From Swiss-Prot:
It is found in: Cytoplasm. It catalyses: an N-acyl-L-alpha-aminoacyl-tRNA + H2O = an N-acyl-L-amino acid + a tRNA + H(+). This is Peptidyl-tRNA hydrolase. The lineage of its organism: Bacteria, Bacillati, Bacillota, Bacilli, Bacillales. The record marks 9 as: Discriminates between blocked and unblocked aminoacyl-tRNA. GO terms for cellular component: cytoplasm. The active site is at residue 19. The gene is pth. Hydrolyzes ribosome-free peptidyl-tRNAs (with 1 or more amino acids incorporated), which drop off the ribosome during protein synthesis, or as a result of ribosome stalling. Catalyzes the release of premature peptidyl moieties from peptidyl-tRNA molecules trapped in stalled 50S ribosomal subunits, and thus maintains levels of free tRNAs and 50S ribosomes. It is an enzyme of class 3 (hydrolase). One of its GO terms (biological process) is protein quality control for misfolded or incompletely synthesized proteins. It comes from the Bacteria. TRNA binds at residues 14, 64, 66, 112.
Length: 186
């Protein structure tokens, strides 16, 4: 089973914020695949189906961003999902709004949700789809920025990136991730 994990924060107040770009991609995939989420005992929302002949699961941790690993590790253990079958989708300050970047592995880059996953999974070697949200201007605090909503100028580019990231995830269901990475990072 492939597990797609979108990082974000639960609750209405965080919907459509920069930090919830991962949730937005997962929601787009659920819409495309016509599946609904159920709350799990692992402190997350999960939906699963068979797509292109492969079992897939979508996960939105409800632990808040900084504790995402507390949801994902037990879920992986329960369903016997190998780290090679996990793809994590999240926001990235170091990419401009609307840009996506796929990676096979890497450090947290200062992202607390990724730090939590690295800690709980015991490895940095999991696949990622990063959604660019850009950096704050005018000395705005990073916390306020990532928890803020996209500006009108950013919105179209980011929504296009959400769709493109969902396309990459769909392709990764049956295509080797390195090949998907080469195509979508071009």
């Amino acid at each position: 089973m492939k597990l797609f994990v979108g990082l974000g924060n639960p609750g209405k107040e965080y919907e459509q914020t920069r930090h919830n770009a991962g949730f937005m991609v997962i929601d787009e995939l659920a819409k495309r695949w016509n599946i609904s989420f159920q709350t799990t005992k692992f402190h997350g929302m999960m939906a699963s189906t068979v797509i292109f002949g492969e079992k897939v699961a979508l996960c939105k941790p409800l632990t808040y961003m900084n504790l995402s690993g507390e949801c994902v590790r037990p879920l992986m253990d329960y369903y016997h999902i190998d780290v090679d079958d996990v793809i994590v989708i999240y926001d990235d300050l170091d990419l401009p709004p609307g840009k996506i970047r796929l990676r096979m592995k890497g450090s947290s880059g200062g992202h607390n949700g990724i730090k939590s996953l690295i800690h709980h999974l015991g490895t940095q070697e999991f696949k990622r789809v990063r959604i660019g949200i850009g950096r704050p201007a005018n000395g705005q605090k990073i916390t306020d920025y990532v928890l803020g909503r996209f500006t009108k100028e950013e919105s179209d580019a980011v929504m296009e990136a959400i769709l493109r990231a969902a396309d990459a995830c769909e392709k990764a269901v049956v295509t080797p991730f390195l090949q998907v990475m080469n195509e979508f990072n071009a």
